[in-house]
Amino acid sequence: MSKHVNGQEIIQLFEQFSPKAFAVEGDKIGLQIGTLNKPVKNVMVTLDVLEQTVDEAIEKKVDLIIAHHPPIFRPLKQITTDQPGGRLIEKCIKHDIAVYAAHTNLDVADGGVNDLLAEALGLTDTEVLVPTYSDPMKKLAVYVPKDYEEAVRTALGNAGAGHIGNYSHCAFSSEGIGSFKPLDGAEPFIGQTGELELVHEVRLETVFPASMEKTVVKALKKSHPYEEVAYDIYPVEQSPLEKGLGRIGKLQQDMTLEEFALFVKEKFDVNGVRMVGERNSKVKKVAVLGGDGNKYIYQAKWKGADVYVTGDLYFHVAHDAMMIGLNVVDPGHYAEKIMRKGTAEKLTAMAGEKNYDVRIFASETDTNPFTFL
């Protein structure tokens, strides 16, 4: 049976794969308009929040908008309803539409903007282009009655523990005998007050990023049958989980720069691209960074990219790219629209696992300000 859900629960689900901790310092993320403490039935994912986006949300009875670009990015000195920005906020409040922004945290996230762009290009052996976040790993060891091992292991895996490379739900189990004596006031799941109890238990071990500790412990306590859960958490000596902006990987087959530029235009479904470099130069290794990636041309070159795909390329940065021998293809900032469908599908799948009664869909409003002649 499906469960009613509120906005806070949807955002908690969203932040499992795109936590606020991933955002670069000073980014304007999180709830920007309205409240999450209300029931939601319809959630719309959009790249931009413009007045026409809000009109679409009103028409489709949307309760919550999840946007990549924050509608409130610079401090507001006033909100006047005879200006577009003020009307946008007024409409959201009047129609009880909450607006939540996930900007650079969604760029960085696994399955976020840059992964979607790399996937659209069919890149293999992908790595982070610009590291921005390092998350040390921790290990959890918990003692579980034998018949409840599977339920706890599944809950921990679903909460994000046990993720190693391209594998999820990784864990190790070993059997033993646990002992305890319930004292006055205890309500033991097994045993009697004042009597020593010996129980066949399983020691279950798994790893998780430190940033997910609260989520993992919450899942542990919810799934574990004991009143008082015996568990240990400790740091492990292994490379921290590295996250960041952009991706770099290899094409499935070599192309010329011109062929690749047309390939980008098709895969990103844009009306045109700009290209820097010799048309017939060979392209195999590709760096891609959604949005404005002007400041990262040197990182792309240092990591061996034959071509750098990014938006909003500046005139003088294009000259710099030419001088260092880096090809560039600029599909525009609007190439990030790929996040609408990708994010909506990912969040829909996660909500389905929770059996939430909610509809999550991509906005259909075209917010690209540019027309190509």
Where are these regions (language model features)?
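Hydrophobic structural segments
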Residues: 1-373
